[in-house]
Amino acid sequence: MRALVGVALDPHAEGTAQETMRTSVSDVTGRCLDETISHFNLQVEREKLYESVSGHVERLALQTRALPYFRNTLQESLRSRSPFLYDVAVYLADRLSRALGITFSDDEIGLLAIYLGLYSRPVNADDHAVSAVVICPRYQTLRDWLLAGLVEHFGNRLQIVDLVSTKEEADEQDCDLVISTTDESSRTHPCVQISALLSDLDFSAVDAALLRAAKAKSRARIAESVRRFLDPELFFTGVAPKGSDEAIGFMCDALEEKGIVPPEFRDSVLLRETYSPTAFARRFAVPHAMDFLAHRTKVAVLIPDSPIGWESADISLVLMLAINGDDYDDFILFYQPLISLLYDSRLYSEIRKVRTFEEFMNFLDNELSETE
């Protein structure tokens, strides 16, 4: 404030005052980014991310730039394709708003999501890698050749956990796939047989095996998440809330009565809605708290008797997310395919017909595993 008064009294001080403000804004932005990165357990290209976000926030703080070209053209795409990153951007916008008094529109939040997408990723981004044991005769030169060739060709898609010489040794390992250069095949794990020459045909065979193994791994992980995060006592039909606030209140009450969330959860959900309403595709909503307040991670489900007015949308399905921070890395692996499924108009029409928890579970178990 003192710097701004100085500018008013001495116009020649404007350059110095703006530079002082830029430094202050940059420092605050750095602290908000630090908190966001820690909160969501991100890996980042620190220098590039900090430079991009700081520059953008400085322009907002100094009001030297308008963004008419970004008027909501990418918001829905960002929310549908990268709901995790969009939530990270909302969290960052909240921290920056509290610290700097800047108001962030949906457009500005979308721009933050773009920067985050360019220069960060979740810590568990490599969880899709397929773990493999290679069966190969005990010739060190041959083993070195195989290892180098497989790693170079498949990179982060393949995690080789061991090289063994017999199928019995491979069967004892905990892995997703066995790659065998001998006539022996594993009886315990999926197995692909290749030659030690690593020809184009061999690479094609391993590539196909990796795709199958990754899909099986994804299906098992999602099935486990469905069982873990859904609860029959938090599945509601035959209810007709009059609006979004009533629907949020109803679901928060249910979560609080089961001891899953504390009383302050409700206010955090409503705060999140003020930044960017959680209605997707004008047909379903995914309200959730700004912070990880839940004692346990659960998803409450509401299929109302009639559509609920949610901002400018009519919502026919509500999924309220109660997330515990310890579960977040696992939860986002379930969250992204769930949102993708609900954006499919055919599948969404089918899920609206569901009336029991068992039907809902079976539907998700069958369909979510096909979305990745």
Regions found by a protein language model. Name each.
Residues 1-335, 339-372:
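A cross-family "folded-core" feature that marks the main globular domain of proteins
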